[in-house]
From Swiss-Prot:
Catalyzes the transfer of the diacylglyceryl group from phosphatidylglycerol to the sulfhydryl group of the N-terminal cysteine of a prolipoprotein, the first step in the formation of mature lipoproteins. Pathway: Protein modification; lipoprotein biosynthesis (diacylglyceryl transfer). This is Phosphatidylglycerol--prolipoprotein diacylglyceryl transferase. The gene is lgt. Disulfide bonds: none annotated. HAMAP family: Lgt (MF_01147). Keywords: Cell membrane, Membrane, Transferase, Transmembrane, Transmembrane helix. Belongs to the Lgt family. It is a multi-pass membrane protein. A 1,2-diacyl-sn-glycero-3-phospho-(1'-sn-glycerol) binds at residue 130.
Length: 254
């Protein structure tokens, strides 16, 4: 799999960056539609995005480097090289949401109003962004048989044939799951006006899928013997259930 999409002069533009950019652009288009559903300001959403997106990239890289610091200890400058991957989505979510919270608090805007609108766009960006892992030949699962991989399209088979071995296309599993969650969140955004429900559903559903898919991967970040992504996913599921229960309970009370 060739990770280079094209060249601009001597600069190689990698598919990883192209795919992330496409995901961000389509996420913004979806947000335009969702802002109309919730009668939220799209201009405010754009301002929020301009703060959240770079914050998420920084957070995703920092999160990854913290758990893989031994790979960078002797060459710290490589910490800033994200063109070949090395972005952890959980770090991106944490930093991005924190940046948005601070910004909206400063603007005296409703946090949940805007993150509800953002949730389908975030998961859409993640669904598309996973294909960047495909082009980088990373974030795959363990070895599989030729018979198993033959059930997938030929280009997937070719991409998952790495150094003489076929691997689980876990990037594809997560991408499909994220697309399904995105569709459900758009539906939920139309059906409920309760603030916070859509965003917390995103946290819970993404975490649910990630927990199971992470168990197949061979490149997990570890805390001792625990896969960090699975630990964060469990916390995300619990947090989601707790918040949604309390949001619904509070609404019934009034």
């Amino acid at each position: 799999m060739n990770p280079i999409a094209f060249h601009v002069g001597n600069l190689a533009i990698r598919w990883y960056g192209v795919v992330i950019s496409i995901g961000a652009a389509l996420g913004l288009l979806l947000a335009m539609y969702n802002c109309k559903i919730r009668e939220a300001s799209y201009d405010e959403f754009i301002n929020m995005f301009l703060i959240a997106f770079p914050s998420a990239i920084i957070g995703a890289r920092l999160y990854y480097v913290i758990f893989e610091f031994e790979d960078y200890r002797d060459n710290l400058i490589n910490i800033f090289n994200i063109r070949q991957g090395g972005l952890a989505i959980h770090g991106g979510i944490i930093f991005g949401v924190l940046a948005v919270y601070i910004y909206l608090k400063y603007r005296k805007e409703s946090f949940f109003e805007y993150v509800d609108v953002a949730a389908p766009s975030i998961i859409l960006g993640q669904a598309i962004g996973r294909w960047g892992n495909f082009f980088n030949s990373e974030a795959h699962g363990g070895p599989v048989t030729k018979e198993f991989i033959s059930k997938f399209p030929q280009f997937i088979q070719n991409g998952m044939f790495i150094e003489g071995t076929y691997y689980h296309p876990t990037f594809l599993y997560e991408s499909i799951w994220n697309f399904i969650v995105c569709i459900f969140l758009v539906y939920l955004l139309k059906k409920t006006k309760k603030k916070g429900i859509v965003f917390m559903a995103y946290i819970g559903l993404y975490s649910l899928g990630r927990f199971f898919i992470e168990g197949l991967r061979t490149d997990s970040l570890y805390l001792g013997s625990i896969r960090v992504a699975q630990l964060i996913s469990v916390l995300g599921i619990i947090l989601s259930i707790f918040f949604i229960y309390n949001i619904i309970k509070k609404e019934k009370r009034y």
